[in-house]
From Swiss-Prot:
Note on how the cofactor is bound: Binds a second Mg(2+) ion via substrate during catalysis.
Catalytic activity, as annotated: (2R)-2-phosphoglycerate = phosphoenolpyruvate + H2O
Keywords, comma-separated and alphabetical: Cytoplasm, Glycolysis, Lyase, Magnesium, Metal-binding, Secreted
Listed GO MF terms: magnesium ion binding; phosphopyruvate hydratase activity
Cofactor: Mg(2+)
Sequence positions that bind (2R)-2-phosphoglycerate: 162, 338, 367-368, 389
GO annotation, cellular component aspect: cell surface; extracellular region; phosphopyruvate hydratase complex
GO terms, biological process: glycolytic process
NCBIfam families found in the cross-reference section: eno
Organism of origin: Vesicomyosocius okutanii subsp. Calyptogena okutanii (strain HA)
EC id: 4.2.1.11
Family: Belongs to the enolase family.
The name this protein goes by in its record: Enolase
Cross-referenced InterPro entries: Enolase, Enolase-like_C_sf, Enolase-like_N, Enolase_C, Enolase_CS, Enolase_N
Length: 428
């Protein structure tokens, strides 16, 4: 079936900023649509999103240029293409852009069409997206990494560490894992209220209180887990996204925790994180070191690589070439997958394949600026990513993905496998 038309429009994301939505329409009038997300803390090597920079509209964040590229250049090029050949569609857009970082057309522009094409193909096949894209026949529901305390670039508070997550590995199913997380979330809210702390939420739906230290976030989460009737380190583990690049001083080569008035060398910050791992049931650390501090990453991997999932986000930016370099240097043991970091579905799948071949785990992830689009939920299942990050247990832009996963689990029935702790089976 061939592409008949492609069109795009400006829509609004969860931070009140414009983003791109594209429709791919086939000759039989089948339609596939997708909206693209946007990040706040971004890696330096990410593919670049295109913004209008016209200060008279949306403070310069409009995407009319991206919309025009879809409606003209991309549409004119892809009309008549076979929708079943998604990789050819993606490669044609990559070639049309002609830059290493997709800076001419914009990664957001290209991605909107890449994802919409996948949806159109699935709809043509009368299949859900996860089934249309799945090639292995096995279906795993991802373990959710629920960001219940927000800090850093995702909140207006004094916490340096960007995300404190709960990971319900002890649940027997995704549905029950979601229940575990929601119950802990509500107990955490009660604790914060009793302590007279703020229960406002950050970009990703987690609470954003001011705390005496970053470590206090872990302690208060453990209290909530216990109050909910679960066992830390058995039913529920903790994960953190340090987003260290956001507080790394490149000139002085130091990690500066402003809220604690502390400064660390790379080795000292590795030891700081290692102490947390020793004292608390932490199973995953994302971006523990700055994206360019590869020597620091080596130290961190040697120290904790057999004990904790070490996730590269800003480090790898969903780029298979950078990931291969990291694998060769034995840096980290996991990669965060964000489709808009690389800009096409084909390149995303290629990166996941590289990770799988190296026995690195892959974590499908949202961005802090999201929409009601649920594509990443299907992608997590289609690619058998063992985990998913899609925020906390509030804000409809986050819960839309959780609700989609509930429906997928129900559809799959006995075919649905929730891996639980096995999602981390590369650890001792």
């Amino acid at each position: 079936m061939e592409i008949k038309q492609i069109k795009a429009r400006e829509v609004i994301d969860s931070r009140g900023n414009p983003t791109v939505e594209a429709d791919v329409i086939l000759n039989d009038d089948t339609i596939g649509s997708a909206m693209v997300p946007s990040g706040a803390s971004t890696g330096q090597k990410e593919a670049l999103e295109l913004r209008d920079r016209d200060k008279s509209r949306y403070l310069g964040k409009g995407v009319l240029k991206a919309v025009k590229f879809v409606n003209t250049e991309i549409c004119d090029t892809l009309i008549g293409f076979d929708i079943n050949n998604l990789s050819k569609i993606d490669q044609t857009m990559i070639d049309l852009d002609g830059t290493k970082t997709k800076s001419r057309l914009g990664a957001n522009t290209i991605l909107s069409v890449s994802l919409a094409a996948a949806h159109a193909n699935a709809n043509r096949q009368h299949k859900p997206l996860y089934a249309s894209l799945n090639q292995g026949g096995n279906y795993k529901l991802p373990v959710p990494m629920m960001n219940i305390i927000n800090g850093g670039e995702h909140a207006n508070n004094n916490i340096d560490i960007q995300e404190f997550m709960i990971i319900p590995v002890g649940a027997p199913s995704f549905k029950e894992a979601l229940r575990y997380g929601i119950e802990v979330f509500h107990h955490l809210k009660s604790i914060l209220e009793i302590k007279g702390m703020s229960t406002t939420v950050g970009d990703e739906g987690g609470f954003a209180p001011n705390l005496a230290s970053n470590e206090d976030a872990i302690k208060i989460i453990l209290e909530a887990i216990n109050n909910a009737g679960y066992k830390p380190g058995k039913d529920i583990f903790i994960g953190i996204d340090a987003a260290s690049s956001e507080f790394y001083d490149n000139d002085n080569k130091t990690y500066n925790l402003i809220s604690e008035n502390k400064s660390f060398s790379s080795e000292e910050f590795v030891n700081y994180l290692a102490k947390w791992v020793e004292n608390y049931p932490i199973i995953s650390i994302e971006d523990g070191m700055d994206e360019n501090d590869w020597n620091g990453w080596n130290l961190l991997t040697k120290k904790l690589g057999d004990k904790v999932q070490l996730v590269g986000d800003d480090l790898y930016v969903t780029n298979s070439k950078i990931l291969k370099q990291g694998i060769e240097r034995n840096i980290a043991n996991s990669i965060l997958i964000k489709v808009n970091q690389i800009g096409t579905l084909t390149e995303t799948f290629a990166t996941i394949k590289v990770a799988m071949n190296a026995r690195y785990t892959s974590i499908m992830s949202h961005r802090s600026g999201e929409t009601e689009d649920t594509t990443i939920a299907d992608l997590a299942v289609a690619c058998t990513c063992s985990q998913i990050k899609t925020g906390s247990l509030s804000r409809s832009d986050r819960l839309a993905k959780y609700n989609r996963l509930l429906r997928i689990e129900e559809e799959l029935g006995t075919q649905a496998v929730y891996p639980g702790l096995n999602a981390f089976n590369h650890l001792n």
